[in-house]
């Protein structure tokens, strides 16, 4: 399967890197203090900024301390982040200025996870605190495309979360490649098991049939 695209926009957690277990541990500890009984992993909030989840679940008067607490907990575990299959090979093959990361994590955490996984950090890196509204709002991917000097319609987004897919579509992104079963029913161009085997050359994104979970 092939797509004509001028730029590549990647979500980070669940697409390029695996930080899921660390996030579960951090949020479980956070919930025990600020939202006892809440099962964070069952809330369907993957891809949403931490500060927006804190607003949903912590008492309003405790927002600042609750937000600082989850930021500290997640940063403590950032060093356990590892690359997901195919991520290093793909991004290492891409010319500078042709791709970036659009993560919901704040800048300190996002950079810590990328570096812990051994991935290159693009100059155009977009994080959750760069935008007024996080995913599923279009802001992250609008900013990512803008930093590459591209129209979103000429870009591809790689996403593993419904909130991220909705963000990409709201931004007018032309191609959305879903990663993993969580986005099988989302508005994606195709779904793959991982980035393994995906290539981009001369404006053509090639997705191997062996990795497809869902195609057009």
Regions found by a protein language model. Name each.
Residues 2-89, 95, 106-108, 119:
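N-terminal helical cap/lid subdomain that shapes the substrate entry/recognition surface
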Residues 92-98, 149-152:
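Short, surface-exposed connector motifs at secondary-structure boundaries
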Residues 1-6, 106-216:
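Asp-based, Mg2+/Mn2+-dependent phosphohydrolase catalytic module
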Residues 52, 99, 200-202:
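Short, solvent-exposed polar/charged micro-motifs at secondary-structure junctions
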Residues 16, 43, 99-102, 133, ...:
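Conserved SAM-binding loop
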Residues 37, 98, 174:
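Residue-level detector of anion-binding/catalytic polar loops
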């Amino acid at each position: 399967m092939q797509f004509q695209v001028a730029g590549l926009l990647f979500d980070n957690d669940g697409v390029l890197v695996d930080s899921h277990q660390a996030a579960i541990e951090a949020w479980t500890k956070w919930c025990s203090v600020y939202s006892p009984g809440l099962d964070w992993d069952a809330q369907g909030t993957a891809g949403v900024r931490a500060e927006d989840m804190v607003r949903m679940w912590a008492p309003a008067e405790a927002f600042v301390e609750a937000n600082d607490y989850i930021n500290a907990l997640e940063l403590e575990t950032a060093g356990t982040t590892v690359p997901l299959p195919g991520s290093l090979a793909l991004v290492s093959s891409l010319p500078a200025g042709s791709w970036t990361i659009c993560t919901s994590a704040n800048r300190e955490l996002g950079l810590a996870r990328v570096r812990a996984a051994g991935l290159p950090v693009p100059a155009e890196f977009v994080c959750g605190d760069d935008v007024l509204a996080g995913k599923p709002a279009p802001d992250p991917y609008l900013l990512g495309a803008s930093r590459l000097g591209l129209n979103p319609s000429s870009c591809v987004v790689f996403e593993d979360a419904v909130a991220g897919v909705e963000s990409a579509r709201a931004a007018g992104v032309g191609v959305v490649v879903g990663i993993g079963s969580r986005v099988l029913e989302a508005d994606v161009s195709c779904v793959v098991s991982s980035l393994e085997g995906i290539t981009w050359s001369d404006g053509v994104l090639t997705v191997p049939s062996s990795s497809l979970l869902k195609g057009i």
